[in-house]
């Protein structure tokens, strides 16, 4: 994505989004663009509440979530919360603060990629999510292993809410 100042993403001959590389990666305008440009977690849900710059999303797969979102969303609308794996944190304890999103599950797989590892977690609902964790210590010192029960946490502004 460092080849040009602006990138055009096409799907079956239709131009879907034109923007800078950071804009396309951080603010995709559709699920298709989000998935095409990199690893992504998609959580489907319904808008339960709209506040000042934030929405509450009710999801059968992940419970009630908070996310930063534009004001034009209305309660009852079907949406998808897009979360990049590197925006998630993984640990043994639920978040300390009330404003963090969280989901519990088990580590199903760990993919070591050198500078980081991808953790695949199966949530209690059955949804599989990925979290990318920087390998800042030696591989033998990682405390979280396959089969461990853990929590995924993320801030409301970590994701992007999409309607298509």
For the regions a protein language model found, what residue spans apply to each?
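Non-catalytic connector elements of ABC transporters
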Residues: 40-42, 50-164
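Internal alpha/beta loop-helix hairpins
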Residues: 1-63, 86
């Amino acid at each position: 994505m460092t080849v040009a100042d602006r990138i055009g993403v096409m799907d079956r001959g239709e131009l879907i989004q034109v923007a800078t590389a950071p804009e396309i990666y951080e603010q995709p305008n559709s699920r298709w663009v989000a998935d095409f440009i990199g690893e992504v977690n998609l959580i489907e849900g319904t808008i339960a509440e709209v506040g000042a710059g934030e929405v509450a999303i009710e999801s059968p797969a992940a419970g009630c979530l908070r996310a930063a979102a534009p004001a034009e969303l209305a309660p009852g609308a079907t949406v998808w919360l897009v979360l990049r794996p590197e925006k998630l944190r993984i640990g043994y304890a639920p978040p300390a603060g009330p404003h963090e999103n969280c989901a519990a599950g088990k580590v199903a797989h760990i993919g070591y990629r050198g500078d980081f590892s991808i953790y695949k977690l199966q949530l209690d609902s059955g949804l599989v999510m990925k979290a990318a964790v920087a390998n800042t210590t030696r591989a033998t010192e990682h405390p979280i292993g396959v089969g461990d029960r853990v929590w995924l946490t993320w801030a409301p502004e970590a994701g992007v809410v999409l309607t298509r």
